[in-house]
Swiss-Prot record:
Subcellular location: Cytoplasm
InterPro entries: DNA-bd_dom_put_sf, EF-G-like_DII, EFTu-like_2, IF2_assoc_dom_bac, IF2_II, IF2_N, P-loop_NTPase, Small_GTP-bd
Region (G5): 513-515
Similarity-based family: Belongs to the TRAFAC class translation factor GTPase superfamily. Classic translation factor GTPase family. IF-2 subfamily.
PANTHER family: TR-TYPE G DOMAIN-CONTAINING PROTEIN (PTHR43381:SF5), TRANSLATION INITIATION FACTOR IF-2-RELATED (PTHR43381)
Record protein name field: Translation initiation factor IF-2
Residue span of region Disordered: 158-178, 200-269
Gene from which the chain derives: infB
Main function: One of the essential components for the initiation of protein synthesis. Protects formylmethionyl-tRNA from spontaneous hydrolysis and promotes its binding to the 30S ribosomal subunits. Also involved in the hydrolysis of GTP during the formation of the 70S ribosomal complex.
UniProt source species: Legionella pneumophila (strain Lens)
Ranges of compositional bias, category Basic and acidic residues: 200-209
Gene3D superfamilies per record: P-loop containing nucleotide triphosphate hydrolases, Putative DNA-binding domain, N-terminal subdomain of bacterial translation initiation factor IF2, Translation factors, Translation initiation factor IF- 2, domain 3
Amino acid sequence: MADVTVKQLAQVVGIPVERLLNQLQEAGLSFTDDQQTVNEEQKRILLNHLKGSSNRDISAAPERITLRRKSMSQVTVGHDMHSGKTVNIEVRKKKTFIKRSAIPEQAEVEEPVVPPVVEEPAHEEITVVSEVSADTSELKETEEHPVIEPVAALDETVKEEEKINSEENTAESQDELTHANTDVIENLVDVVEEAIPVSKKEEVKPEKVSKKKHLEQTDSDISEFKKGKKKPKYHTFEHDEEEQELHRRGGRSKFKKKKGTEKSDKYREAEETLTHGFALPTAPIVREVLIPETITVAELAKRMSVKAAEVIKVMMSLGAMATINQVIDQETSVIVVEEMGHKPVIIKEDAVETGLGEAISKGTKTEGRAPVVTIMGHVDHGKTSLLDYIRRTKVAAGEAGGITQHIGAYHVSTPKGDITFLDTPGHAAFTAMRARGAQATDIVILIVAADDGVKPQTIEAIQHAKAAKVPIIVAINKMDKPDADPERVMNELSVQEVIPEAWGGDTMFVNISAKSGMGIDDLLDAILLQSEVLELKAVTDGAAKGVVIESRLDKGRGPVATVLVQSGTLHKGDILLAGFQYGRVRALVSDNGDLVDSAGPSIPVEVLGLSAIPHAGDEAVVVPDEKKAREVALFRQGRFRDVKLARRQKTTIEGIMENMTATESKVLNIVLKADVQGSLEAISDALTKLSTDEVKVEVISSGVGGITESDVHLAIASNAILIGFNVRADGTAKRLAEQESVSIHYYSVIYDIVDQIKGALTGMLAPQFKEEIVGIAEVRDVFKSPKIGAIAGCMVIEGVVKRNNPIRVLRSNVVIYEGTLESLRRFKDDVLEVRQGFECGIGVKNYNDVKPGDLIEVFETVEIKRDL
């Protein structure tokens, strides 16, 4: 090669110029500039210098390098990937690299004594350890498991090979150079491969037979595995050149076999024992399939442990088409389950509720309890005054005014016994409790003003009490007034079938005055006497059961529910289920505001700790655990949601038509509230007179006073219009009406109510239609059009012919076709209408049999407005 500059030489070698200059200076050559020329002699000196430094690096390298690696994996052993057992596999690999100069020293080391292999019983989880001792020589293989020969040494004798292998094991215990640099290892591999010449004869002779056998065995295994005849007995993680050794976790493996020998009988037995397989069941598996009222095809297939496609096939064979997400009924599910050979078990809708009743612990100890009294009556008849007087006079000393005003129930102790009063202004709570079947009230006190007599709400209270089959005690209030007339009250109540005992009936009448306190003690005595007749008793030692009187959301304490315990004892810390809500009782507050630890029958308490606010009238019960409470609460919420969605249609005057069907008699329900009784009767009579044979007006509820929550509930349940005459709805009723999308109509003039209801009834009448002929055209000639078909050339002889109107084709005054006028042209121009005396071309939609002389009659359908 010709002389080159330092820069050109650096480009040829592929290193930076600065590095080449440093190497030239280290070699003893004086080069300082990249433009200096380098001759052949200087290149040779540089090359010898670089080779010398490389040899020094190699001689300074360690004589032995051992590399260890460990990897973890999992293997599924069994018939398939789903039913097999997963075992953990640990693969240990070791590679030892030895310099040539170290071999003679290792040959002098004696061979260590190898302890015998101890076989241990199999465990569920095994660890696979592959100790790999590899050199440049090829590896020896056997038929089943690869076993690697020791490292080949420079000497050509087998003894020296074994000594070298022993020395490797000894060096392994010393853990020399475990974390060697990977680049150095690769360089040393190249050096060792060049430095260790191995005789071809000795390299090939011991491996020809075993390697050939192994290849034949491997080929046969692969062919059988591809054909599906044979499963692989183990997973291979490395090449066949590596030694693999199976170990049990915590002990030696029973799979380890001696080198150069065949598998022993014990090894074969152990392998057969550990071979996982799947045995087909000898008899079909019959399952009990739980079937609710509705279930999807996918869920039904899952419960039978089959694929959804199988269920769909069975349903198709039975003549029913279904998709995987389709909901099928209980009867269809039973037929499908029986067809597939399983046993159906029908689940009832209230199975969760039934299970709740079974889970509640029943008590055995019964004791007498205090009566629960509800005071009802008409507005301004003294109900609140009576409650205030009893509260003021019967509260224990030092607790005057200590009754919590929000609780809605309180307990009164008298010398003759205890009484629990429910403060239920109006009838909303009582109605809700009776509707939910919660018979919380034992006695009803009916308050009637002696100077006012029986009023509509008084009659309503009597109806509620009779429907609940609760005894009534009549308290004639305001006896201190000069115009008090108790005889008039008794006469009016006898009309409602409330007969006093003095007249031979079974109802006690007590004359009282809530203002002066006259007759209050007699009223309490009558209550206790009536309770003795009823023989009220309750279980005291079982799980508590009661009813929610009212509930509210307290800003500082969260949901607070007033619960009247009916049986059992409610303790602090119990799991309470109340309607849709549940929770652990965090605190119990009595009616006078004190914290208590428990509450027995007929005792009202405030409960803190529920998840949300329950409804008034909900049943409250103590359940054994929170899981059961959550299950029942979620079930009730789902059922309530379904019912709510089922009646999702709104109640408005505009939507009445949507709720009516042609086959049903059309009735307009009205809930009416007015300010005075006279106006109420006048409006009711005027609306009732609007009824005809086709539509009727039915006032399902009417009363004097403001619109309450119970009125809104009644309007929702009966699909009625809520009308208020000179009255307004309270806050609770407004919120409920907005929540349920019920419109409340306010009026101040009676005639406005009559006109509005008359318009609603008019809209409910069945519509009537009339056909009016607007024009007649006579066909003079027929033309053919490639786009439309037959075109009738006509003369309008009467009226106006309009496009897109319905038409009739008459031939000899007989209707032969009825359709729509599709095309209307005059002098090739599309027109909307053609009047009498003009010619036009008419195209009839989907009809081509038009002939000269036919008449085309154009008409319109007009709806006739109906009035009452």
